[in-house]
């Protein structure tokens, strides 16, 4: 009898720990919650304030699971603004100063992949001047910095996974029909 009680206790404790951790990671919220927490909604995803501490907000990313219900995917430990976001069906990009951070969004937290592109390195000092938008798996931006001691602007095309960068010869090569903040619901 003691063995049965011990086994049942171990199983219950294991279920309690695994159940609690899964519930907190996959928290579901309604669209009202997103809006009440200064959220941004996209076609398939949303971002809302997750926590407010010491006058600093942290955000969570949610996947739409029904027309007005979202499932929490992961937490962003940084403060963001709407104009720093670029979203596509598969990526969410946060663009700040000289850095682009992309999150490849899939259905679960285990599948979220973070990618990053830094323009301000020890060798090159560039900042992102303008984000033109997204088209056919490429992000188009302009970067400003010094080259040979002179102020310079370059027009750059990045693959959606930020793995490759092409410097364009001129702004005229940036497509005019780019979509900025694609799928942003207003």
Where are the language model's segments positioned?
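Bacterial signal peptide processing site
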Residues: 21-23
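Short loop/turn segments that connect beta-strands within beta-propeller blades
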Residues: 65-68, 105-108, 159-163
């Amino acid at each position: 009898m003691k063995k049965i009680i011990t086994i049942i206790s171990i199983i219950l404790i294991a279920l309690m720990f695994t159940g609690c951790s899964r519930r907190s990671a996959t928290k579901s919220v309604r669209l009202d919650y997103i809006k009440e927490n200064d959220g941004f909604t996209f076609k398939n995803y949303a971002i809302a304030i997750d926590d407010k501490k010491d006058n600093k907000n942290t955000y969570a990313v949610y996947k739409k699971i029904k027309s007005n219900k979202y499932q929490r995917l992961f937490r962003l430990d940084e403060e963001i603004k709407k104009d720093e976001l670029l979203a596509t069906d598969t990526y969410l990009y946060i663009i700040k100063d000289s850095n682009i951070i992309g999150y490849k969004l899939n259905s679960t937290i285990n599948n979220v992949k973070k990618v990053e592109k830094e323009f301000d390195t020890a060798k090159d000092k560039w900042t992102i001047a303008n984000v033109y938008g997204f088209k056919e798996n490429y992000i188009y931006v302009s970067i400003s910095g010094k080259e040979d001691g002179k102020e310079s602007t370059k027009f750059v095309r990045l693959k959606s996974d930020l793995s490759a960068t092409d410097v364009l010869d001129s702004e005229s090569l940036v497509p005019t029909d780019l979509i900025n903040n694609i799928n942003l619901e207003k």
